[in-house]
Amino acid sequence: MAEAELHKERLQAIAEKRKRQTEIEGKRRQLDEQVLLLQHSKSKVLREKWLLQGVPAGTAEEEEARRRQSEEDEFKVKQLEDNIQRLEQEIQALESEESQISAKEQIILEKLKETEKSFKDLQKSFSTADGASGWSTVLLQGDELTADPIGTNADMAIQKPPQLSEDANQLRSKQDNCGDSRLEPAASSLSPDHKNMEIGVSVAECKSVPGVTSTPHSKDHSSPFYSPSHNGLLADHHESLDNDVAREIQYLDEVLEANCCDSSVDGTYNGISSPEPGAAILVSSLGSPAHSVTEAEPTEKASGRQVPPHIELSRSPSDRMAEGERANGHSTDQPQDLLGNSLQAPASPSSSTSSHCSSRDGEFTLTTLKKEAKFELRAFHEDKKPSKLFEEDEREKEQFCVRKVRPSEEMIELEKERRELIRSQAVKKNPGIAAKWWNPPQEKTIEEQLDEEHLESHRKYKERKEKRAQQEQLQLQQQQQQQLQQQQLQQQQLQQQQLQQQLQQQQLSTSQPCTAPAAHKHLDGIEHTKEDVVTEQIDFSAARKQFQLMENSRQTLAKGQSTPRLFSIKPYYKPLGSIHSDKPPTILRPATVGGTLEDGGTQAAKEQKAPCVSESQSAGAGPANAATQGKEGPYSEPSKRGPLSKLWAEDGEFTSARAVLTVVKDEDHGILDQFSRSVNVSLTQEELDSGLDELSVRSQDTTVLETLSNDFSMDNISDSGASNETPSALQENSLADFSLPQTPQTDNPSEGREGVSKSFSDHGFYSPSSTLGDSPSVDDPLEYQAGLLVQNAIQQAIAEQVDKAEAHTSKEGSEQQEPEATVEEAGSQTPGSEKPQGMFAPPQVSSPVQEKRDILPKNLPAEDRALREKGPSQPPTAAQPSGPVNMEETRPEGGYFSKYSEAAELRSTASLLATQESDVMVGPFKLRSRKQRTLSMIEEEIRAAQEREEELKRQRQVRQSTPSPRAKNAPSLPSRTTCYKTAPGKIEKVKPPPSPTTEGPSLQPDLAPEEAAGTQRPKNLMQTLMEDYETHKSKRRERMDDSSYTSKLLSCKVTSEVLEATRVNRRKSALALRWEAGIYANQEEEDNE
């Protein structure tokens, strides 16, 4: 009982000591953390001080903040220092308590060892009677010896545990797991004397008591040394005590192991580690333990008794070490698992050193493994064994893997299955993949992938390609045939020569029989060489011809493709005449184009609002048809376009740009529809839906004129051609011209946009065609650049053409008045060149603003009119009778401005290349890329607004200065009168169309002021610019300070309906105002020059 109490006290002391140790560890951690924080804070303070040294003194607040920060840092540093000192003191206190507890524990251990001595005596007596108890004592002694290398006696072993406990405490505080090292050194350190001393007992005991150590003894041992599970003879007496104590000791050992590295042997000693509860738990009859032990016992006995004690000691220490290890934690549970197997209890993992105990050890290790996974010693042993086993396995596996070879077929199948599995998984994640895998994408032909629009071009491209290939093949075949023929001819010639030579040789041979053979041979050699040379020459020439043919074909193709691009701007002019004629059929419904243009003669009267329209249409009936064909030709065929554009450029007058203002009355909607289709073709759905409708169209008309002048670099066109185009835009011709360039794009939309175009035509159908044609096709950059060139060119052209325009104006004055009256008649007659002229006059009539313009800028309207009439009449005339004539006529003006148009073309070529084919097809006006249309539309609207302002100003000026009755009548017949009166400054080269002129007047009155304004808008940018300039001039004369905004407001009043229909106001931004101001200033400067 005393023993049990001692064990309990010891356990309590151990628990308290462990508690102190954990507290010390925690404090040390805190201390480390505090030290780190202190170091960090100090470094931070130093860094801040260092950084602040070079900082200039800041505001008081900043200084205060810095000071507070430094104070806070210093305070933190002080706090940390205080904490560190406090923790150090606490750690010292805990360590002192721990030392006291450890001393107490040592005292208890000494007492326990004293009691153990008595048990040992008993065990010795038992061992003599029944070796089991002796064996257990030997094991216990062995444990003591292993634990204490110093102890030589059993007493010493008893004393050693306290020492070991101290060592263990130190180790635990250091968290060092040196148990293994200590056990081994202990065993090894045992002097032979010690070994012999203990072995003496161990030999006798081992022999006698393999696993039957007396339980009480086991108790003692278990407490200090884990006596191996001792089912000693005394088990009955001390069974209960042993069980309780052993369990407590086991618990403590487990706790110690868990908390510390009790795996060390010291742990076992201190923790009474394996109190191998087994000793008590393994209680069994003395016989049974003996029997259980007998298996291993015989060996032990044999080894112990027979083997010299030294050997036995060597093994027993190992066993003891093993037991000690078990005590550390391995064997704590072993005894319970090994109930009845007293041998197993003694056999600790370490006992594996002895072959006999190894089996026991193996068993024990299994049991210990179950409960003692935390033991490092055991883990160490496990590492050894499993590592070996694992290495062996690896070797085996490697060998096995080498052998593992599947047949290629099986591998292929497995690979297929693997891929299918991967596919199935991938399909789950991305079902779209399934379509690709399971239904591999059947390569779609290009035709299936392309849209309808592109499909047609692709087919044409393929056809061209096939044609080229066929042509090349044919050429090759022809060349080959020629070569063959040449070769045959050469062969024949050679044969003839040979025959001749043979004859000669024969003659020679007859005459000179001796020399004949040599001569013949010689001749033959010559012939052969000749043949070779000839064939080479033939091959060379054939190849050269073939190469030339290929080059020619390539050049022609390249020319055909590149021409539209090169003349992208000129086609602009050309389209005015040529394109219009070709494209109106395309853009307008081709059938209707011809019919409509023809009807234009009759409709021209109706279109008196758009006298230009009637003129161009009437002209369009004949010339427009011709022009349409020409346009279609040039546009449909890039090569054709190129020539047409060239012709236009050559036509000095951009009148060929049939800017016949087609101010179509509502009744003329048929024509307007056709034109609107063409115009609408120009207009994109976005443009139509942009709320710009009529206004947009009008602005677009101006834009078309501007773009015509700009894109064409149509400085001439801008005035004559542009003004003409403005009216032309109204007229089918102008519409067709402008829209025709656009027709490719607008063909489809033209019909859809007919309504819009009609509204445009009402407000200035001409504008839709020109605007539509221009705005979509013309690139904004081109417009801008061309606009600059055009403005300059306009000034120059105006100066040059003022005379012409004046002459034309005088002609137009009479002709236009007549055409206005006879516009309808001219409309019918318009098919001829005269009709376009007449129609041009009506467009002038149709734009009352033009009249005002004419009055204010008399030069411009007159010139415009003259140019219009000339242009439309010439282009239509040329178009009907000869498209080139129109082109040529245009070239004269174009000749003057050709440099501008060419420059503009060159500038626009790069940007247009992408969209050029379609845009160019549409005509010079279609040089704009669709992306730029919005900008161009804005510019157009701005120009339209400017034109409206100018119209208002002109109206005022007309009222004030009514230059002539025509001018007064101009409001009713704005375009005609305006054109007449604008003669002096305008570049219009009007070839008065007598009959259209008659129609013009009648159309003019019909044209509403809106249409007149629209007609004005269709005027070329040059016209509008000149009119604006004149208006500004008049403003200066009148000292009118109306800002462009106020003038816009006035124009809004005049054209309130148009403004309501459109959203021009939203376009009036500061930039727009500045832009307008810039245009006026530039014009003024130019005029002043």
From Swiss-Prot:
Sorted UniProt keywords: Cell membrane, Coiled coil, Glycoprotein, GPI-anchor, Isopeptide bond, Lipoprotein, Membrane, Phosphoprotein, Ubl conjugation
One annotated Gene Ontology cellular component of this protein: side of membrane
GO terms (BP aspect): actin filament organization; cell surface receptor protein serine/threonine kinase signaling pathway; protein localization; regulation of cell shape
GO MF annotation terms: protein kinase A binding
Expressed in which tissues: Highly expressed in lung and weakly in thymus and cerebellum. Little or no expression in liver, heart and cerebral cortex. All isoforms are expressed in lung, but KL2A and KL2B isoforms are the principal isoforms in cerebellum.
Residues where Phosphothreonine is found: T743
Effect the entry attributes to changing I794A: Reduces binding to RII
Start and end residues of each stretch annotated as PKA-RII subunit binding domain: 782-795
Highest taxon of source: Eukaryota
Region: Disordered, residue numbers: 165-194, 210-231, 289-362, 429-517, 592-644, 712-783, 800-899, 915-934, 946-1021
Position(s), cross-link Glycyl lysine isopeptide (Lys-Gly) (interchain with G-Cter in SUMO2): K370
Biased composition (Basic and acidic residues): 173-183, 317-328, 455-470, 801-814, 850-871
Subcellular localization: Apical cell membrane
Membrane topology of this protein: Lipid-anchor; GPI-like-anchor
Coiled-coil spans in chain: 70-107, 928-958
Annotated crosslink Glycyl lysine isopeptide (Lys-Gly) (interchain with G-Cter in SUMO1) location: K370
Function, in words: Binds to regulatory subunit (RII) of protein kinase A. May be involved in establishing polarity in signaling systems or in integrating PKA-RII isoforms with downstream effectors to capture, amplify and focus diffuse, trans-cellular signals carried by cAMP. Binds tp and modulates the structure of the actin cytoskeleton.
Identification of the protein by name: PALM2-AKAP2 fusion protein
Organism: Mus musculus (Mouse)
Annotated gene: Pakap
